[in-house]
From Swiss-Prot:
Organism: Penicillium rubens (strain ATCC 28089 / DSM 1075 / NRRL 1951 / Wisconsin 54-1255) (Penicillium chrysogenum)
Entry keyword annotation includes DNA-binding: no
GO biological process: terpenoid biosynthetic process; ubiquinone biosynthetic process
Biological role: Prenytransferase; part of the gene cluster that mediates the biosynthesis of andrastins, meroterpenoid compounds that exhibit inhibitory activity against ras farnesyltransferase, suggesting that they could be promising leads for antitumor agents. The first step of the pathway is the synthesis of 3,5-dimethylorsellinic acid (DMOA) by the polyketide synthase adrD via condensation of one acetyl-CoA starter unit with 3 malonyl-CoA units and 2 methylations. DMAO is then converted to farnesyl-DMAO by the prenyltransferase adrG.
Localization per record: Membrane
Pfam families, per database record: UbiA (PF01040)
Protein name: Prenytransferase adrG
GO cellular component: mitochondrial inner membrane
Superkingdom of the source species: Eukaryota
Length: 325
C-alpha cells in the first residue's frame, strides 16, 4: 500500500457532525464541535473564576451580575477553544499527517484548505472578542494574554519537552473573571495565584493523560511533550500533578477563609474525581488510554487491585527510577 493510500482516511462520523451540511461539516469538525468535553474544560475555569470572585468579594455581588459575567465569559471561552483547535491543527498539519489518530482530520485529508483554516481562526477570535464590549477594559488585556499563549502552544511541541506549560494560560480565567466583576486580583494576590496554579496544573494533567495515547508515534515523528519526556514515569507525573492541584485549591480556600463545605465538596471532590480517572487510565498500552478510561472507569476505579494501588505503584516507580539513576 502506498503512502498516498495510507493518508486517504474516512472522516469521523457522529450524531453532531451529521447535523451539518457536508460542505460545512469539515469546518465543524475542525472546530471540535463534536468534542463537547473540550468546551467544558475551557468554560469551567471561567465559571470557577466567577464563583471564586463572588466568594472573596467584600460586598455582595447580585446574582444577576454573576450570571451575566458567567454568560459572557462562557461565550468567550467557547470561541477561544474552537479558534485554538483550528490554529493548532493548521500549525501541526505536517505532523498530524504522520500520526494514525490525527491523519484523518480535515486539514491532513484535504477537506479544508490552510487558507480557509487561517480565515476561520481569525473569524473565531474576532467573534469571541466581541464580548469585550460588555466587559471592563482590563479584560481586554487578559484576552490578549490568553490569546498569545493559545497561539504559541503548537510551536512549543517542536522546540521543548514542556509545551503543556503554555496551556496554563487557561488559568488566566481567574483574574479575567475578577476583572469582569470589578475586583483587583492584586488585592488577593496569593489566593488568586493559587487558583491560577490549580487550574493550570489540572489542565496539564489532563493533557498529559490525553497525549499519552500518541507517545509511540510522537517519538518517531519528533513531537515533543511532557508525555514523551516522562513516558517511563507518566503515572508518577500524573499523581504529582493531582496532589499539587489539590494542594493549590486547598491553599486558596485556607487563605480566603472558605468553610468546611468547600473543602469537602470542592477539594475532596476534585481529588476523588481525578483519582478515579487516573486509576482508570493505568493500562499497559498507552494507545488505549482514552477509550479505556471512557468505558472502564467505573469498574477500574472501585475494583480492588493491589498492582494498581497508589502505594504499591509509587514504591515500584521509585525503585525503578533509582535503578535507572
Amino acid at each position: 500500500m502506498t503512502r498516498r493510500n495510507e493518508k486517504e482516511e474516512v472522516p469521523p462520523q457522529g450524531k453532531i457532525l451529521d447535523l451539518f451540511h457536508p460542505g460545512i461539516a469539515p469546518y465543524a469538525e475542525l472546530m471540535r464541535i463534536h468534542r463537547l468535553l473540550g468546551f467544558y474544560l475551557n468554560t469551567s475555569p471561567y465559571l470557577v473564576g466567577v464563583a471564586f470572585s463572588a466568594s472573596i468579594s467584600s460586598t455582595k455581588i447580585p446574582i444577576a451580575v454573576l450570571l451575566h459575567r458567567a454568560m459572557l465569559l462562557s461565550i468567550w471561552s467557547i470561541f477561544l477553544r474552537s479558534a485554538g483547535c483550528v490554529w493548532d491543527d493548521l500549525i501541526d498539519m505536517d505532523l498530524d499527517s504522520q500520526i494514525s489518530r490525527t491523519k484523518s482530520r480535515p486539514l491532513p485529508r484535504g477537506a479544508v484548505s490552510p487558507s480557509n483554516a487561517l480565515l476561520l481562526t481569525v473569524a473565531l477570535f474576532a467573534c469571541g472578542g466581541t464580548v469585550l464590549i460588555f466587559l471592563p477594559w482590563a479584560c481586554t488585556v487578559d484576552c490578549l494574554i490568553v490569546t498569545f499563549f493559545a497561539l504559541s502552544y503548537p510551536f512549543g511541541k517542536r522546540f521543548t519537552d514542556y509545551p503543556q506549560i503554555t496551556l496554563m494560560n487557561i488559568g488566566w480565567a481567574v483574574p479575567m473573571a475578577m476583572h469582569s466583576l470589578g475586583l483587583d486580583p492584586l488585592s488577593q494576590m496569593t489566593p488568586t495565584v493559587c487558583m491560577f496554579l490549580f487550574i493550570g496544573s489540572v489542565i496539564i494533567m489532563i493533557d498529559v493523560i490525553y497525549s499519552r495515547q500518541d507517545t509511540e508515534e510522537d517519538l518517531k515523528v519528533g513531537v515533543k511533550s511532557m508525555a514523551v519526556r516522562f513516558r517511563d514515569s507518566i503515572q508518577l507525573l500524573s499523581y504529582s500533578l493531582l496532589c499539587a492541584s489539590t494542594g493549590f485549591l486547598a491553599m486558596a480556600g485556607v487563605l480566603t477563609g472558605l468553610g468546611l463545605p468547600f473543602f469537602v465538596l470542592s477539594v475532596g471532590g476534585h481529588f476523588c474525581g481525578f483519582w478515579v480517572l487516573l486509576r482508570a487510565t493505568q493500562v499497559g498500552k498507552s494507545s488505549g488510554v482514552e477509550s479505556y478510561a471512557k468505558y472502564n472507569m467505573p469498574k477500574q476505579a472501585f475494583r480492588p487491585r493491589p498492582e494498581t494501588s497508589c502505594a504499591t505503584w509509587l514504591l515500584s516507580t521509585s525503585r525503578n527510577e533509582m535503578g535507572r539513576a
